[in-house]
A protein has these predicted regions:
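Conserved C-terminal guanine-recognition region of P-loop GTPase G domains, centered on the G4
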Residues: 141-266
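Conserved G1/Walker A P-loop phosphate-binding module
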Residues: 2-173
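Amphipathic alpha-helical protein-protein interaction segments
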Residues: 28-32, 71, 75, 88, ...
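Beta-strand cores of modular interaction/reader domains in eukaryotic scaffold and signaling proteins
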Residues: 81-83, 117-120, 169, 203, ...
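Interhelical loop segments of eukaryotic multi-pass membrane proteins
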Residues: 363-391
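Amphipathic alpha-helical interaction motifs in eukaryotic regulatory proteins
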Residues: 43, 96-100, 120, 192-196, ...
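C-terminal end of P-loop GTPase domains and the immediately downstream helical coupling element
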Residues: 228-370
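Conserved beta-strand elements of beta-rich interaction domains across eukaryotes
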Residues: 89-90, 123-125, 175-176, 208-210, ...
């Protein structure tokens, strides 16, 4: 029953997330930004081919999987994945709500987010649980290996079109804390696994007491081993530290703690951000929210370039494999022709040999007496006359 409900949820979500008629899809694409359209078009070329749902249209993946080719290709995602990590109460969920201009994630001082929540754009407000989420995001198959995680992965589908949200999948993560706090799964290992499958990682530090959380620092150190280029750091809730020298002190503490754990620390930046509201409207505090948005926009542009390059490379590899298979086929055809001609020649020679042997056997069996009489009565007298004439 649970699986049936998950399947029903998934089908409903997909119906409202992009699986529509060609006319509806064309109208929907016209409303998208250029980068969204490019990402969607690349995804469709891999999935359905250049003619979409038309009969006979074949996608790049299906071509690559042909038994004669077997070229390994990965389908690019049609959205940019943004992973947000940090200690609890760092403002991760609040930032997502602000970006999409919708209160879709629960926020508060308490540890509200105990699992991973995908926040994505669709045509109907929808909430998906673990089974449906894993079915919706097929690249999450490996995440199921973490015991206890399936019941703690969710998807929230929002109808928001704010900023570049239609091109983004936000991943809200559990707040990281030290001490006796127990998670129902290995949260650090799960974050590291997800980092392999995202395009951008935003790290938020809460300046009020938790910025130097040991668990957060360990996760950041591990992420820097493989994903240093994906990481962007921010001190969130800067408006809660009213005095400039207090903010500078917190920034220095965070920077010192991170300096020995991250790569390229000489280029390290830690801008301060806070979400604007009526209470801080007149605050004279630097707010780098626009930089966060620019980081996200940059990730979208880079993903577009990366997907275009990947598609070009995949098509080139398929083309080379096709040429290789055709050349191999021509070689085999030529060899088959040679073998056929050789076989025909041997067959003809065998028939000649059989005919000759049959003729010899026939002569030996039936014509020996006739030949002897012919020689004695005809050839021999003429030979005698010839020699007699010479002797005379």
């Amino acid at each position: 029953m649970q699986m049936m409900n998950a399947t029903k949820q998934l089908m409903n979500a997909k119906d409202h997330a992009g699986h529509t008629t060609d006319n509806q899809e064309k109208q929907f694409l016209e409303q998208k930004s250029p980068n969204e359209r490019i990402l969607k078009s690349i995804y469709d070329l891999y999935e359905r081919g250049p003619n979409g749902n038309q009969p006979g249209s074949v996608g790049i993946l299906e071509i690559a999987k042909d038994p004669l080719l077997v070229v390994q290709c990965w389908k690019p995602r049609k959205k940019v994945s943004v992973l947000i990590i940090g200690n609890h109460s760092a403002g991760k969920s609040s930032f997502i709500n602000w970006y999409i201009d919708e209160s879709i994630q629960t926020t508060g001082v308490a540890i509200e987010t105990r699992g991973f929540t995908y926040v994505t754009s669709g045509r109907k407000r929808e909430s998906l649980k673990g089974d449906a989420t894993f079915a919706f995001y097929d690249h999450l198959d490996g995440l199921e290996k973490f015991e206890g995680i399936q019941a703690n992965v969710f998807t929230e589908v929002s109808t928001s079109k704010e900023k570049n949200f239609p091109a983004i999948d936000f991943i809200d993560t559990p707040g990281l804390v030290d001490g006796e706090m127990e998670y129902p799964f290995d949260v650090s290992a799960a974050i590291l696994w997800l980092a392999d499958h995202v395009d951008l990682i935003l790290v938020f530090f809460d300046p009020i007491g938790q910025a130097l959380c040991g668990r957060t620092m360990k996760v950041i150190e591990a992420l820097n081993v493989k994903h240093a280029e994906k990481l962007s750091y921010y001190m969130s809730k800067a408006d809660q530290v009213e005095k400039e020298h207090d903010r500078q002190r917190v920034l220095i503490q965070i920077t010192q703690n991170l300096s020995g754990r991250i790569n390229n620390s000489h280029a390290f930046k830690l801008p301060t951000i806070y979400l604007p509201n009526e209470h801080n409207a007149n605050a004279n505090i630097p707010n780098a929210l626009s930089e966060v948005c620019e980081d996200i926009d940059k990730a979208i542009r880079l993903t577009v370039q990366k997907n275009l390059t990947a598609m070009k490379d995949d098509c080139a590899r398929i083309d080379r494999k096709v040429v290789e298979v055709l050349e191999e086929d021509r070689t085999k055809r030529a060899e088959n022709v040679k073998r056929s001609m050789r076989g025909a020649a041997l067959l003809a020679l065998s028939w000649v040999f059989i005919f000759f042997m049959t003729f010899v056997a026939f002569v030996e069996l039936f014509a020996f007496r006739f030949v002897g009489n012919f020689v004695r009565k005809t050839i021999m007298p003429r030979c005698n006359d010839f020699f007699a004439a010479i002797l005379m």
